[in-house]
Structure formats: C-alpha cells, structure tokens
Amino acid sequence: MGQLISFFQDIPIFFEEALNVALAVVTLLAIIKGIVNVWKSGILQLFVFLVLAGRSCSFKVGHHTNFESFTVKLGGVFHELPSLCRVNNSYSLIRLSHNSNQALSVEYVDVHPVLCSSSPTILDNYTQCIKGSPEFDWILGWTIKGLGHDFLRDPRICCEPKKTTNAEFTFQLNLTDSPETHHYRSKIEVGIRHLFGNYITNDSYSKMSVVMRNTTWEGQCSNSHVNTLRFLVKNAGYLVGRKPLAFFSWSLSDPKGNDMPGGYCLERWMLVAGDLKCFGNTAVAKCNLNHDSEFCDMLRLFDFNKNAIEKLNNQTKTAVNMLTHSINSLISDNLLMRNKLKEILKVPYCNYTRFWYINHTKSGEHSLPRCWLVSNGSYLNESDFRNEWILESDHLIAEMLSKEYQDRQGKTPLTLVDLCFWSAIFFTTSLFLHLVGFPTHRHIQGDPCPLPHRLDRNGACRCGRFQKLGKQVTWKRKH
C-alpha cells in the first residue's frame, strides 16, 4: 500500500521528464494494440464459443434476425363481404357478411323440381321472390353467376316467393338429366366444386336440382376465405395483367376507408392481433417493384377494400358492381385456379392464409412476407423450406447494408471523399519520391557548387561565361 502511495506522489516528477512521457505513451499504445490484436485473432471468441456451445436452442436465423409468421383473418378485412363454407357433400352456406346472422343455403339434392309450374319468370331480377329481403338480392345474383348459370341460354330458374316477412323463399335449378340439359348439369357441378371445394359424388344416385333458401347463421361450419376469394373472382367480368399501370397508385387506409399514410398496421382489424407487426410504406414500395408476391396480392386487395367498404355500406347493387370491377385487378394470373391445380397434383401451393418473413429485431427491418405453402392439407414444416428463409435472411442483411451505405454516402459530401482520397495518394507518392532522392544539378568533381551557373557535361557553363575545362562532372541532389 505504501508503494502505491509513493507511486502516486512521484507522478508529477515522473512526467517532468520527456523520455518518461514518451515511454508511457509507447507503453499505452502497445497495450491497446496488443488487446486489439488478441481480439482480432479470435481466441477470445473461440473460448466463448466452446463455453456456450450447445446451451442455446432458440429458433433464430442469424444474429438479430428471427423467423416469424402471421395468419390472415379475412373476417377482419372483409366486414361486408360474404363468407362461404361447406357443411357436407350436399349442403353449403353463404353468410351475407362476417357480422350477419343471415345466410343463403345452397343444397345439391336429388329432389325433382316441383316449383316451375307456378313460379314467376326470373331474368336477373329476384324482387318478386324475395319481397321484404332486399339484402339477398345481390348475393343471389353473385351465387347464380358463380354457379355458371346463363339466363339467356340455360333452363329457367324456378322460385317460390315469400308469403310473410319471416318466411323462406326458395329457388330451384333444374338439373334433370336429358340430352338437352346434360351440359348444363355438368357446368353447375363444376361451379359448385369451384365455389365450395371438392366433394364426394355417387354416380348411381344423380342429383336433380340445386335449391337455394334464406336461413339463419348459427355457426354450422367454419368459414374459408379462399372460397370467398374464388366467389369474388368468379364474378369478375375479366382478369387483367397484374402490374401497376401508369395511373396506378397506392392508397393506404384504415377499416373505415379513411386515409392512413403511416402504412398497413397488421393489428386487430386487419391481419393479426396483438400489435405483432406493421408493414408500412417499405412493404408497399417492394410490392410496386416485385408485384408477383402473394402477400402483395393481399395488400392490393386491402387497397381496393377501402372504397368497397364505403360503397357496400349503402347496400346497393351499384356498390357491389363497383367492387366487382375492383376485384378484376386483384389476381391477374389466376393464382387461385393455379393453386387448385397444384392441390390436385399434390404440389405445395398457397392458400393465402399464412405468411412468413424475416424480422431484424435490433433495427426493426423486415423482409417482404412470403406465403407459407400447404401440402396434403397441412402447412409445410419449417425445415422443408429452411434454405429459402436462410437465403431471405441474407437478402435482408444485404439490403440493410446497402441502405446504410447509401445513407452514409448521402451524409458525407462526395467532393470531400475524393479530396481525402487523392490527397492520400499524393502524400504516398511524395513520400516515395522523397525516399528515392532524384539528382538536380551537376558539380565539377572536387570543386564547390557552381551556383548560380549551370554546367553541361563538358564542365562548361551553359551561359558561355566559362569555357570547356575538360574536368569530370557529377550529378548532385543537394547544394
């Protein structure tokens, strides 16, 4: 302890000597440089690795990057659009909206049509049969068109009008097999499969009619937003190429249709609950560049949903037609039908329900969500596409580094960077020239410098004052 006190007392005297100061500086620099060299050598990292190896089994892609996912809940997106589901092979339901307690039942039965003798003629107008229930007008039109019925060429639809306010109305499509209606029956069967999914058929007991009635929704089956998308696309008049046109622009909104420039926050009303993630303008910009992603299809659907929600609140057929034109631009290359083909061929496909992405927990950056594929009715295991999300992690890191580089380039003037670079080149070149030492003038061997005269190789002055001396000359660098 006494030696330590004596050392502190002698510090002023110690630093009075310049040599001691130099030694202290050199010692400090050597210690710091030694620590840096030891750290860069990797021996400390190797020791930490050997101590912690096998103690952490967390599911992480890399440093500060996590593999995360979320599930789309279409009920939060389409508040006013119908939802479809199948109860059994012959009974399906179309709920008017996700908040409605009314539904339209579609039965594929083997009962012979009995209503056509006394029913009114229906030509795309259902008012006479659904008196007191105008909310079923457009859903009936979409369902009949979705099944593939043509009012001009196909057999007429029969209906039994409502007798009272709370009574049922009934519509029947005649599928009795005959040479004239065989094609019509096949077309309706294809429409049922397309809207409600595959079902088991028994060729020995052929169905004779499709019956549609109004009923109440009591949770008879679970909704499928894939069927809802098929229902919307089936009623679209045409499909256009999926790419932003010259006048195309993104419009961000909340569930009520109000502009929300902050981005798509996927919480509560939209995709996921619990403030999981907000995909803002960055994701929108990526979708404008790479618009072949299933997630971009969903974002485009949300974008069109803004005006659709405002118009559907009026519960008019014009509003529904406006939504039809919006859906036309949703999925151009018909991904739903393509996925249906993949489902039949047992190839993994996207059902627009679950998406995965890479999240950088430290910076908050994330990759554009990609669809979690389905095979044989279940989601793929994470190990089945491990290479894909590891590669996506690398792309995210590369994108972040590129943004940081561009940001730094923007903060540092390029002229200053160029000036610093060329000044360093000039200093290095001048140092090299200084070490080489180029000769500058001639001397007569054994004589002093002849300044201000300059000698030629014969020892004579170039100005003519001195004649040839015949003495040896040599080059010198310094005077």
Swiss-Prot record:
Ranges of the Cytoplasmic topological domain: 33, 440-479
Gene name of this polypeptide: GPC
Organism: Guanarito mammarenavirus (isolate Human/Venezuela/NH-95551/1990) (GTOV)
Entry keyword set: Disulfide bond, Fusion of virus membrane with host endosomal membrane, Fusion of virus membrane with host membrane, Glycoprotein, Host cell membrane, Host endoplasmic reticulum, Host Golgi apparatus, Host membrane, Host-virus interaction, Lipoprotein, Membrane, Metal-binding, Myristate, Transmembrane, Transmembrane helix, Viral attachment to host cell, Viral envelope protein, Viral penetration into host cytoplasm, Virion, Virus endocytosis by host, Virus entry into host cell, Zinc
Protein name listed in UniProt: Pre-glycoprotein polyprotein GP complex
Residues linked to a lipid group, N-myristoyl glycine type: 2
Site feature (Cleavage) residues: 58-59, 245-246
GO BP annotations, alphabetical order: fusion of virus membrane with host endosome membrane; receptor-mediated endocytosis of virus by host cell; virion attachment to host cell
Molecular-function GO terms, alphabetical: metal ion binding
